[in-house]
Amino acid sequence: MQDLIAKAKQQAQQAELYQITVTETPVRYENNKLKGIDASSRQINALRIVKDGKLGFATSTGDNLQPLLDMAAATAQFGRDWDLPLPGPAALPQVQLTHPSTVLDTDTLVEMGEKLVRRLAKCHPDLLASADVSARQTTTKLINSQGFAGEYSKSIFSILGGAELTEGKNFLSLYAGYFSGKREDQLEKTIESLVSNYEHGRTNVPVKSGKYTVIFTPQGLGDIINPLLECANGLAVEKGFSPWKDKLGEKLFAEEISLFDDATISFAPASCLFDGEGIPAQRTAIIEKGVINNFILNMVTAKALGLKSTGNGFRSKNGELSSPGNSNVVLEINGTQPLEQLLGSVKQGIIIDSLMGAWAGNPYSGQVNGNIALGFLVEDGRIKGRVKDCMVSVNVFEAFRHQIEGASAEKEWAWNMLAPHLKLSDISISAKG
């Protein structure tokens, strides 16, 4: 890698080489049976150069790096203007990204998938269970002509489980899973979640249209948090799509809410030591006690806004040029109580575990509308059964300003987000008929 950078410096003012190697063993089950084992390994190389003030870029696979320089130089004459200095040497955070528990052989992965599928299949003879169990190891390297040289290895264990059951006109679909850099009890938690939702979901209960207290599970919060993340994205701010462009330092939400992007959590799914541009990973307060504190920025959007990069210049799996993106998202709500008490405080309400179609709206309006894919009616603190053919409508900006009623002390990971169960008041539910 150093040799290529040295050669690039002979014909370009700046150069950067990014390399990621991924080894993965995914085991897949479908319809209660082993579907396949697809072990794979790949290496992606990406060279960025700045030549005569223009950006050149090229990617390749495998170990042969030499053609990259010619390809990048050829694209530079058509590239965008570039006047940003690449990052120099920097102190990197201390983050644990590998753990022996995630080094798993194929037989162990198969056994875990088999255990999940067999347990779900016991619920009902017609239930179709699926599972994806994977162990992935990555090594990321980045070196540039300004003196930055960084490398880290990372391991991720993932388990995703699903179940489908059709009884007459009633269709029940469930899913749950975890991504983590440390294997603990994720298999057991996935099974427990799916079995519990199956047991509660077998009974359909009627619900009328109206305003309800709603508890969003950590998994169900993804669509609710998304407008906040989209508004904080540096590209949306730069282009003027985000309503937060001129709102830094303003209190837009209740004091109880804080929202962070944190790439420095050991063993978390989206942690790293540096981003795809060589900026050290950090914890960024997007919202702190209701105040808009920062945006999610890579180098380009940071310069456009007159701010500093937050270390969120992430690349796609093909190594393409970075764009602003989130690492680990952490939602914090003041005034928590045990989940059992939070649920017990609901006289009549709904638990929402997943939505369908909520992504289709305009995130910058804060409005989220979607079908309740999996939700349950709660009366006097007890789950009565599954609600069907219902839609939820919530303006996230208003909800986080005036409608927070509480949150669970327990937090759970849902993909790359760590969040509590969140209780909101006066949420609109529309029921069919």
Name each model feature, range by range.
Residues 5-7, 34-38, 107, 116-123, ...:
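A generic local secondary-structure boundary/capping motif
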Residues 6, 12-19, 23-24, 66-152, ...:
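Acidic low-complexity segments
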Residues 10, 14-44, 128-149, 347-371:
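Structured beta-strand/loop patches that form or line metal/cofactor-binding pockets in enzymes
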Residues 11, 247-433:
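Dual-mode signal for accessory low-complexity, basic/Gly-rich regions
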Residues 27-32, 138-155, 169-177, 224-230, ...:
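Short acidic, glycine/serine/threonine-rich loops at helix termini
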Residues 27-77:
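N-terminal alpha-helical targeting/anchoring segments
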Residues 38-51, 150-177, 286-288, 372-380:
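Short beta-strand elements
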Residues 152-252:
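Internal metal/ion-chelating core segments
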